[in-house]
From Swiss-Prot:
The record marks 379 as: Transition state stabilizer. This is Putative pectinesterase/pectinesterase inhibitor 28. Pathway: Glycan metabolism; pectin degradation; 2-dehydro-3-deoxy-D-gluconate from pectin: step 1/5. It comes from Arabidopsis thaliana (Mouse-ear cress). Glycans are attached at residues 40, 93, 278, 297, 413, 566, 570, 581. The PMEI region may act as an autoinhibitory domain and prevent untimely PME activity during transport. Residues 570-732 are annotated as: Disordered. It catalyses: [(1->4)-alpha-D-galacturonosyl methyl ester](n) + n H2O = [(1->4)-alpha-D-galacturonosyl](n) + n methanol + n H(+). It is found in: Membrane. The gene is PME28.
Length: 732
């Protein structure tokens, strides 16, 4: 088979380079998830003969940030072999034993701890390292069936895995914020080499991706268009269920509090979910408020939750950081099993603003979909932790950093509902946590609407709403074709703490509308980007999260590309009968559409119909779609000024209900600010926490291996209401 090159030797060399780099990369990944790996240097290193293996390792380590760690680690067990497969086998076997030993030591540390929060943090680390090992196993298998013409797909998966591993490591360390004793320092030292090796592995795969992109090999760079196909893991029965009206659905299990199903609680039902199956398993959760804490474990893949509507089926909890629980562990619902789908359900945390960080849902599942769902909380409501996620026609409510995490997530036609925070707290909406510039993660808000509850609108002058702030150094958020109300101040974005992340973040606004959409007075940090047409395309669902391979076929309205102008699109809408016969705007993608005073009628879908819902669909979805949103919301909160017509979803017509954010920092962050707007609270361990110390590496440099350089674990410091005040860390 020809790959576009005449020289057979050149082809052979390129193939060898790819296999070699992939193999050594895997070794790095294996070692990276090992806590306490030791790097032993040879006493006679000066006399060591430079072998073929050493030369190969030096070449592979060239693009990394921590070259010495890279070379020393790979040479430790490589001996004189230069066979990539043997290197992989040796490293894999040695690492599995190392991880087993570390697990035993971690358990011993847990048993010796007197501080309950420290015990919880150690348990959290143990869980997260286990997830990383699971990802490694899948990667090892993927590499075992290596196919040259599919290497680009393999690289995408490896980048996703490495990005998630960085998130796991950082979340482990974040859990020790506010703990007593030396457990946190012990784990930080043990993880130092692992953190460095993970960043090194990501550097290798990124370098390889760039190299392959320049090669322009047709067989590798061509991708099948899957918009008319169903994902490989979606069986025919599941497709029928997801596209059928609820009255016709015959789920595998029914949960009903009134006794009309097989089980009365969700956790009872989960005991009967098949483990590690490749077929979809559907759970119908009937109307009711389910006060239980639910975790969809890693083994529960291809699971579907279908409710009776986000105003009827509610999963409710109230755990909070203030109660002595790590932010990670406060989640009412945790989704870990890949290929998860939820429709017509509400997830809530009722702890309130006074309790600081309190997560309604934490999502780690790759290729997860949420349609017509509601996420209610205050600080840190939706924890989009890691991997690829897609949200359509959902409502997310909160005060501070209520959309945070390090996932690659697209929110299409969703409503961001700002709630009343504590006194003098500002309300930053997003707090993305990217730690490495090479991570394939970030938040994309496409065709969304920002609105406020009436209680918030009453204090919007004192508590401003911001589009977001940088939780970690390389925070990335793109907002496009979205309605931005008047309670978002002209500066738009809020700093985390001082100058932290302002040079290295990646924020961009594209063709937004509404009275707060003008960018002429936005902050001018080095990290604010003006994207070209070509660059914008990279952040659409089809390219950014490879959505064409797994979103179509679910009955979920899905726009795979760009909207034209203020919400119109010439892209295909798959999985629904919604039309996209709108004209293309001549505006440049980086141009802001002149804000209109009312939200556009005809947004592509609407959020849930619960009292806090904000948008009601102007266009009804066809019966039988995956949880088509109810047509009549019981209560509508709409923007004070309406967004331009043509948005992907429009708020209700009642302008008075739209609440604009105030300048105060969000209530409930770990370390809520004092009543004085200018006061700054030290960041806590939660997701949006401000840095505990100045980063050891300049923001413009690559992330330091030392965990202490990053901001606190979760947004735990509430931002001050005053724009001039340094925001306090609030994710924690």
């Amino acid at each position: 088979m020809s790959y576009g090159y005449d020289d057979e030797d050149a082809k052979r060399k390129k193939r060898y380079v790819i296999i070699s780099i992939s193999s050594v990369l895997l070794i790095s990944m294996v070692v990276a998830v090992t806590i306490g790996v030791s790097v032993n240097k040879s006493d006679n290193a000066g006399d060591e003969e430079i072998t073929t293996s050493v030369k190969a390792i030096k070449d592979v380590c060239a693009p990394t940030d921590y070259k010495e760690t890279c070379e020393d680690t790979l040479r430790k067990d490589a001996k004189d072999t230069s066979d990539p497969l043997e290197l992989v086998k040796t490293a894999f076997n040695a690492t599995m034993k190392q991880i087993s030993d570390v697990a035993k030591k971690s358990q011993t540390m847990i048993e010796l701890q007197k501080d309950p929060r420290a015990k919880m943090a150690l348990d959290q680390c143990k869980e997260l390292m286990d997830y990383a090992i699971g990802e490694l196993s899948k990667s090892f298998e993927e590499l075992g069936k290596f196919e040259f013409h599919k290497v680009d797909e393999a690289l995408v998966k490896l980048r996703i895995w490495l990005s998630a591993t960085i998130s796991h490591e950082q979340t482990c360390l974040d859990g020790f914020q506010g703990t007593q004793g030396n457990a946190g320092e012990t784990i930080k030292k043990a993880l130092k080499t692992a953190v460095q090796l993970t960043h090194n592995g990501l550097a290798m795969v990124t370098e390889m991706s760039n190299y392959l992109g320049q090669m322009q090999i047709p067989e590798m760079n061509s991708r099948r268009l899957l918009s008319q196909e169903f994902p490989s893991w979606m069986d025919a029965r599941a497709r029928r269920l997801l596209n059928a009206p609820m009255s016709e659905v015959k789920p595998d299990i029914v949960v009903a509090q009134d006794g009309s199903g097989q089980y009365k609680t969700i956790n009872e039902a989960l005991n009967f979910v098949p483990k590690k199956k490749n077929t979809t398993f559907v759970v119908h959760i009937k109307e009711g408020i389910y006060k239980e804490y639910v975790q969809v474990n890693r083994s529960m893949t291809h699971l579907v939750f279908i409710g009776d509507g986000p105003d009827k089926t509610v999963i409710s909890g109230s755990k909070s950081y203030k109660d002595g629980i790590t932010t990670y562990k406060t989640a009412t619902v945790a989704i870990v099993g890949d290929h998860f789908i939820a429709k017509n359900i509400a997830f809530e945390n009722t702890a309130g603003a006074i309790k600081h960080q309190a997560v309604a849902i934490r999502v780690l599942a790759d290729e997860s979909i949420f349609y017509n769902c509601k996420f209610d909380g205050y600080q840190d409501t939706l924890y989009a932790h890691s991997h690829r996620q897609f949200y359509r026609d959902c409502t997310i409510s909160g005060t501070i950093d209520f959309l945070f995490g390090d996932a690659a997530a697209v929110f299409q036609n969703c409503t961001l509902l700002v709630r009343k925070p504590l006194l003098n707290q500002a309300c930053p909406i997003t707090a993305h946590g990217r730690k490495d510039p090479r991570e394939s993660t970030g938040f994309v808000l496409q065709g969304c609407t920002i609105v406020g509850e009436p209680d918030y609108l009453a204090v919007k002058e004192q508590s401003k709403t911001y589009l977001g702030r940088p939780w970690k150094e390389y925070s990335r958020t793109i907002i496009m074709n979205t309605f931005i109300p008047d309670f978002v101040p002209p500066e738009g974005w809020q700093p985390w703490l001082g100058e932290f992340g302002l040079n290295t973040l990646f924020y961009s606004e594209v063709q937004n509308t509404g009275p707060g959409a003008a960018i002429t007075k936005r902050v001018t940090w080095p990290g604010i980007k003006k994207l070209s047409d070509e660059e914008i395309l990279k952040f659409t669902p089809a390219q950014y999260i490879q959505g064409d391979a797994w979103i179509p076929g679910k009955g979920v309205p899905y726009i795979l590309g760009l909207f034209s102008g203020n919400g119109s699109t010439n892209s295909t809408v798959t999985g629904s009968s919604l039309s996209s016969n709108t004209t293309e705007s001549s505006d440049s993608p980086s141009t802001v559409v002149t804000p209109s005073t009312s939200p556009p009628a005809g947004h592509l879908g609407s959020p849930s119909d619960t009292p806090s819902s904000v948008v009601s669909p102007s266009t009804s979805l066809p019966a039988g779609q995956l949880g088509a949103p109810p047509a009549t919301p019981s209560m509508v909160v709409s923007p004070s000024t309406s967004p331009p017509a043509g948005h992907l979803g429009s708020p209700s017509d009642t302008p008075s209900s739209l609440v604009s954010p105030s300048t105060s920092p969000p209530a409930g962050h770990l370390g809520s600010p004092s009543d004085t707007p200018s006061s700054v609270v030290t960041p806590s361990a939660s997701p949006s926490t401000s840095p505990s110390a100045s980063p050891s590496v300049s923001p413009s440099a690559f992330p330091s291996a030392s965990p202490s350089a990053s901001p606190s674990a979760s947004p735990s410091v509430s931002p001050s209401a005053s724009p001039s005040a340094s925001p306090q860390s609030s994710i924690g």
